[in-house]
Amino acid sequence: MSRAIESVAVIGTGTMGSGIAAASAAAGCRVLMLDLTEEAVDRALGQIDDEHRHLVDTGTIEDDLGKISGYDWVCEAIVEDLDVKRELFVRLEELRKEGSVISSNTSGIPLRQISEGMPARFLEDVAITHFFNPVRVMKLFELVPGEDTSDEVIDAFASFGANQLQKGVVHAKDTVNFIGNRIGCFFMLSGLHLAKPFLADGMNQETVDAVLSAPVGLPPTGLYGLIDLIGLDVMELVGKNLAVNLPDGDTGHAYTEFPAAEQAMHDRGQLGRKAGGGFARQTKLDDGSRHKETFDLTTQDWRDAQAIDLEGVPSDLGEVLFEDSPAGSLA
């Protein structure tokens, strides 16, 4: 039988879960948003446009998990911890309705690990549905089947992603970090290490971000700005996942841990935008303007953000890679 997705239950209402819920509501679906606390769900409701609020029901995982039985797609979007995910999926499988589809928004944990020991119905109905942050803006939607996932389930997810959510669906294999994050996380984690000599030679972090953005075909956030958006807590979990799952001899093993300065930031809760600042922060002044600051990795202190001067740096990828300059060497 064909599977139609007309309603979506999202478990976990953090940055990604709230984004998936908002996109689904905007597509006209009934949406259920559940998290550990009512406060977390209330914050996430701010992502839902007023015109779509009537489509959204909310609750807590402890009190309202049974509500998922009324939804076509059950989407897990909780913390990147395999044991926690597996524990939740056992509960979800007991409660979801026959004919529903179920997925994880994990950014890189293999589906075979999530599915280990689960019943046949789960194995046939489960997939990875990996969205990218921010969900409303990013077109990429990775769809990863398990060994036993049925074709009709994959077709349902692909159709919903392309037609209702207007995403570009990329079919990926069940390998660590799939496609996007296998490339992107290597860039970010290795970039933290490989930028160190340039910082030591006097290049500031703003210039690192500027070079590692438009000139090399990457988002304007650059390196540090992108990690600020994702969060150092998420990146640390990604690194641990890579350390366990990368093949022996893979170059990525050299970069699965943070450099010392970035690890210290993580340990004191300086995680990024969601924590009030990571590598950068903004403060609203009395006159309404914003004061931008950068956390200097060399001095380990906040300073005023510096203007960027990329005069003479080529904007074409092929040229900047071979530019005889610090910017070219960094790229």
Segments (PLM) and residue ranges:
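N-terminal glycine-rich phosphate-binding loop for ADP-containing cofactors
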Residues: 1-331
